[in-house]
Amino acid sequence: MAHMQKKGIKVSGRLEKDNLTVYTRCGKIIMRSATSEMPRSRTREQFISRQRVARNSNLWKALRASGNCLFAGGSTAYARYCSLMRKMPEVFMTKEMYRNGGTLLLPGMPVSDGILPDIGYQWGEVEGAGAIVTSIRVSTPLSLNPTGTDMVRALCGRNGYWKVGDTLRLYTLVQTVENMIPKVYVRMEEALLAPGDSVWRFANLEPRAVEGRLALVGNTLADRNRGWALVHRREDRSSSQGVLTRCTMYEPYTTEIALLQAAESYGGLTGQPFLTPGKG
């Protein structure tokens, strides 16, 4: 309350009137005027940049949920990941989608970055069935035993850059839609190249030899909403690998209509009139 006195105004408590607030602090009268601020600038370029940040952040969280992320740089690993993601298609999702963990499976998206030689892989066929054919050399035919493949003999014996103690890591990425929100889930499996641990640990993919190269065969490869990546790991070092996928669910999110719908969910763009998608 404010009270009139002979020597001025006595203020006790807090007085608010319109956009003016008056209160005391340490024996002094503080007056503050509240003014309305313009909403944060959201030009087209700024909005695309912020969408990119949200895209990278959610996909990074999905990768981390599968295990430790193999990106060089230690504390700067996320920055390196974001740098590699610049090559990926721009996708636009609404505020609600990103707030609820929305993610999209992108062809070639990075899962690792390091100094070890990359593993090459591409789509192929084995006896009429779909396969992922890699650049990893193996003996032909590929020897199998009841518990799996002798990984040490198959990989280390034919590839000079593979050593006992290395691991072959398989990432499986699955694109789903939950409550109208697209989400990517990542599963990681590892096979250790050690004489006493020669079990083939990739449950859904069977190893085959194709012209002296390791190929992976399995019914799940026909699923167009999945993606795979193989990574060579040695302690804290790894190869640089991206995702092989036929998934196209991301494509509608790359359009101008998707951009405008996403922008509308954030309050629209500044610096240009907003047009409702589909209307002139």
Predicted features, each with a name:
Residues 76-278:
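Charged linear interaction tracts used for macromolecular binding and regulation
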Residues 1-126:
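Long, polar/Ser/Thr-enriched low-complexity segments
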